[in-house]
């Protein structure tokens, strides 16, 4: 959990297990091997991440050989049995992936500890109607699967399941439903009553949490921040943004050539890769219609490992850019945006020749570079 800028996340335990693994493995490799300290404040509902951290601290090599996905599956099998674990693991992996893109606590587009009062007001995320509906559908599918398992569970397992699976997945789904449906409703594209029903569902789920075995353990409104309230009804005359269509998209693992370490499950598509210093990844594409291309590079927004820099270059058909830096300073505006969306983004327009095929080469110039995605766009018309 976290208290502070740009926004708290004290409610649900959505820190991605693969991020815990990537960061702590990196720390161990860099010599932090004598003592790891875990601050256990709000343990519920972060039990799995706590167990993963402690297992890594006790025997990192064993977890490394097992892999994060297998470690999580073992956790679910221990609690719910083999067959149910087979069905639940994809559900939990997708729940972590969706929350990696945007945490439930960040869905109101608000911030904490800012002087400008606008950051206390629920406002639109920069997402198109298509992107909103796709995210709502993904959460709806997860919630339905969780509910199916709930009805099939033996009575002695229901409290554990509610705590570890049902509440965190369905509460996150309803938080997204509450705020994204409200965003659509502000533009006349959804019913405000659906947003209100999502809020009521969170209240009901939390009441269920706090009236049985886990009495008084869960608060769905930490610090009583605006994002946790019922959404105020208001109309906007402006339209929702259109989704910009990329011509080519790759995740880190899509490279045609190169050596990297896949960060199992990490990233917007679960395919981010760690690229060692001076190592290259090659991506190939075919004929391009214009004489230039806009390249958008999306990276894990981590801290520098050596010195104070995080840099890479992009080479298109042998013509390289200068070093591109993406490290940030804590509490800067860019740092806040990176935390909220879990990506550091750099864009550049490069010339492209008229030929049948092209090679785009990504080169890491520092240790600690993790590539998530690369998008190619037709340049914007000025």
Q: Where in this protein do the model-derived segments appear?
A:
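Extracytoplasmic
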Residues: 222-382
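Substrate-binding groove of N-acetylhexosamine-processing glycoside hydrolases
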Residues: 1-257
